[in-house]
Amino acid sequence: MRIIEGNLVGTGLKIGIVVSRFNEFITGKLLSGAIDGLTRHGVSDSDITVAWVPGAFEIPLVAKKMAESKQFDAVITLGAVIRGATSHFDYVCSEAAKGVSHAALASGVPVIFGVLTTDTIEQAIERAGTKAGNKGWEAAVSAIEMANVLRTLA
């Protein structure tokens, strides 16, 4: 039996990160967590490219362009969508998730969904480096693992 698993060694990997400026007090912490996770696993600062976009709805297009460029072994998407009083939250979350998934499937490059979708600001803060860890860091580790899984399959 052959088992395929990705390791968590990031040396030599080139990583793109798309991060939304909306709710930057949260997304900035996710970005810091992602960069920390990447560099602790061997990814060089010079191999990380960060693209800022206005909001979560804009993330998929830039993620797809980065993935299709074949300059990156993986792309991480970071955002924070916090529920408000209207249905806008549902549309943005749904389209962001679908778009990120499409970017990965269309390009063949791992595109990691690190967009927080929370009911409250407190939940977002918890997931950006306090009680619930840092989801940016977790997305970075997922990106490394998936890039290495795909290298094994190549």
From Swiss-Prot:
Pathway: Cofactor biosynthesis; riboflavin biosynthesis; riboflavin from 2-hydroxy-3-oxobutyl phosphate and 5-amino-6-(D-ribitylamino)uracil: step 1/2
Superkingdom of origin: Bacteria
Catalytic activity, reaction form: (2S)-2-hydroxy-3-oxobutyl phosphate + 5-amino-6-(D-ribitylamino)uracil = 6,7-dimethyl-8-(1-D-ribityl)lumazine + phosphate + 2 H2O + H(+)
Residues reported to bind 5-amino-6-(D-ribitylamino)uracil: 22, 56-58, 80-82, 113
Keywords: Riboflavin biosynthesis, Transferase
Binding site residues for (2S)-2-hydroxy-3-oxobutyl phosphate: 85-86, 127
InterPro entries assigned to the protein according to its UniProt record, in alphabetical order: LS, LS/RS, LS/RS_sf
Pfam assignment, any one: DMRL_synthase
Residues annotated as the enzyme's active site: 88
Record GO terms (molecular function): 6,7-dimethyl-8-ribityllumazine synthase activity
A GO BP annotation: riboflavin biosynthetic process
EC number: 2.5.1.78
Example of a GO cellular component annotation carried by this entry: riboflavin synthase complex
Protein's job: Catalyzes the formation of 6,7-dimethyl-8-ribityllumazine by condensation of 5-amino-6-(D-ribitylamino)uracil with 3,4-dihydroxy-2-butanone 4-phosphate. This is the penultimate step in the biosynthesis of riboflavin.
Family to which the UniProt record says this protein belongs: Belongs to the DMRL synthase family.
PANTHER family recorded: 6,7-DIMETHYL-8-RIBITYLLUMAZINE SYNTHASE, 6,7-DIMETHYL-8-RIBITYLLUMAZINE SYNTHASE DMRL SYNTHASE LUMAZINE SYNTHASE
Complex formation: Forms an icosahedral capsid composed of 60 subunits, arranged as a dodecamer of pentamers.
The name this protein goes by in its record: 6,7-dimethyl-8-ribityllumazine synthase
Encoding gene (name): ribH
